[in-house]
UniProtKB/Swiss-Prot annotation:
Organism classification: Eukaryota, Viridiplantae, Streptophyta, Embryophyta, Tracheophyta
SUBUNIT field: PSII is composed of 1 copy each of membrane proteins PsbA, PsbB, PsbC, PsbD, PsbE, PsbF, PsbH, PsbI, PsbJ, PsbK, PsbL, PsbM, PsbT, PsbX, PsbY, PsbZ, Psb30/Ycf12, at least 3 peripheral proteins of the oxygen-evolving complex and a large number of cofactors. It forms dimeric complexes.
Species per Swiss-Prot/TrEMBL record: Nuphar advena (Common spatterdock)
Gene from which this protein is expressed: psbB
Topology class, membrane: Multi-pass membrane protein
Protein name: Photosystem II CP47 reaction center protein
NCBIfam families: PS_II_CP47 (TIGR03039)
GO biological process, one term: photosynthetic electron transport in photosystem II
Length: 508
């Protein structure tokens, strides 16, 4: 059979046994990739600093997904939250990876078995003796089983009734840990940032799936609907399955990029909107002001800011700063964060406190402008020194650090002040190690960006696939070139072509 590459899947079109076989083999490949990728990531992952070098800075992709489902310990003796452990149990990162690889091997063997033993009785229609599948019944079975899995996940795994729970954190990604979740049955359950909605929605959707599955197992579709939607054609199944997949891909691309309870910032990094809105900056200032209200000094107030919170307020952790074709982890870009230098506060010779205007997300370069509390420009680093009025030298800007490694240190020489003003454009200032990984200083995206880009791209491709296969199954007779006024009853055989002498026909 001389098939072109884009039509090779027609070999399983009317062969249920081998159709099942190739799907099992596909599952083997997916599971094998997941397990192998997990082992690779574990081989290169450095768990020593969960605050300044978390998994998302290291470009980990599958470790965050395992972690959000409750895996936190490694057979290597470390925990994702820091510290050492003695008894990680079987469901460690390596245990989950191994289970996927074992499952992949079993699926591989099952796929071979079904390829060899393709002509099973279960695939034969008793009336005709030909291979056929009762697709509406199979739909009911799959709906029922997926409903059971969905309900079980929400009612047992997430709630901790039989399972670890899921990763839950505070709004600023500081206190995350795996814990059981109670379902949220009120309006708050529809808030995408409320973890309880994950439990309640899985329970509700699972219940609906079980009931819908039982319905489709016990009720046959009407003949007109069966014919209108081509329910007897396997390509209808392909088209509707692709629709389900691309819809899910669009949804998860959204929940990942905009953030939700399912994509914690401790595991996937912050979102770009948290930088755009000054989300962490506002919380830092709120905490500092609260400290000052308790009669703490400026230095003491800033010293109480956790490094983790300060690190989120750094543009290098913004997933939108990485280019699409800049391969590698964030650590390969601006380097491995070593420590927080502290918060710089700039002042001019008149005593005004100055704030450096921060770089917007989609700028690579941005003018250094310092404004006072009223937004009035007081100082800058001019492009043309001959026309400058507000240069650091003319205005007499000084900088003093509060909190961090440089706490209490001040500088008044213009070159140093300008250096820290440029760095303050990028948020809180960190010492970054570029030597270890030979980092090039160009920002990279986090796994949040890669996941979103990948799923949005494939969702678009799968959307066209749904249209393509849906059109093929709905207009199959048109594409085959059949005259609608044909007065002969044609039975489509192997070739399904009009004028083919092997196609049986009967004059009406």
């Amino acid at each position: 059979m001389g098939l072109p590459w884009y039509r090779v899947h027609t070999v399983v079109l009317n062969d249920p046994g081998r159709l099942l076989s190739v799907h099992i083999m596909h599952t083997a490949l997916v599971s094998g990739w997941a397990g192998s990728m997990a082992l690779y990531e574990l081989a290169v992952f450095d768990p020593s600093d969960p605050v300044l070098d978390p998994m998302w800075r290291q470009g980990m992709f599958v470790i965050p997904f395992m972690t959000r489902l409750g895996i936190t310990n490694s057979w290597g003796g470390w925990s994702i939250t820091g510290g050492t452990i003695t008894n990680p149990g079987i469901w460690s990162y390596e245990g989950v990876a191994g289970a996927h690889i074992v499952f992949s091997g079993l699926c591989f063997l099952a796929a071979i078995w079904h390829w060899v033993y393709w002509d099973l009785e279960i695939f034969c229609d008793e009336r005709t003796g030909k291979p056929s599948l009762d697709l509406p019944k199979i739909f009911g079975i799959h709906l029922f089983l997926s409903g059971v899995a969905c309900f079980g996940f929400g009612a047992f795994h997430v709630t901790g009734l039989y399972g670890p729970g899921i990763w839950v954190s505070d709004p600023y990604g500081l206190t995350g840990k795996v814990q059981p979740i109670s379902p949220s049955w009120g309006a708050e359950g529809f808030d995408p940032f409320v973890p309880g909605g994950i439990a309640s929605h899985h329970i509700a959707a699972g219940t609906l799936g079980i009931l819908a599955g039982l319905f489709h197992l016990s009720v046959r579709p009407p003949q007109r609907l069966y014919k209108a939607l081509r329910m007897g054609n396997i390509e209808t199944v392909l088209s509707s399955s692709i629709a389900a997949v691309f819809f899910a891909a669009f949804v998860v691309a959204g929940t990942m990029w905009y953030g939700s309870a399912t994509t914690p910032i401790e595991l996937f990094g912050p979102t770009r909107y948290q930088w755009d809105q000054g989300y962490f900056q506002q919380e830092i200032y709120r905490r500092v002001n609260a400290g000052l209200a308790e009669n703490l000094s400026l230095s003491e107030s800033w010293s109480k800011i956790p490094d983790k919170l300060a690190f989120y307020d750094y543009i290098g952790n913004n997933p939108a700063k990485g280019g699409l074709f800049r391969a590698g982890s964030m650590d390969n870009g601006d380097g491995i964060a070593v420590g927080w230098l502290g918060h710089p506060i700039f002042r001019d010779k008149e005593g005004h406190e100055l704030f450096v205007r921060r770089m917007p997300t989609f700028f690579e370069t941005f003018p250094v402008v310092l404004v006072d509390g009223d937004g009035i420009v007081r100082a800058d680093v001019p492009f043309r020194r001959a026309e400058s009025k507000y240069s650091v030298e003319q205005v007499g800007v000084t900088v003093e650090f509060y909190g961090g490694e440089l706490d209490g240190v001040s500088y008044n020489d213009p070159a140093t002040v300008k250096k820290y003003a440029r760095r303050a454009q990028l948020g809180e200032i960190f010492e970054l190690d570029r030597a270890t990984l030979k980092s090039d200083g160009v920002f990279r995206s986090s796994p949040r960006g890669w996941f979103t880009f990948g799923h949005a791209s494939f969702a678009l491709l799968f959307f066209f696939g749904h249209i393509w296969h849906g059109a093929r199954t709905l207009f199959r007779d048109v594409f085959a070139g059949i005259d609608p006024d044909l007065d002969a009853q044609v039975e489509f055989g192997t070739f399904q072509k009009l004028g083919d002498p092997t196609t049986r026909r009967q004059v009406v």
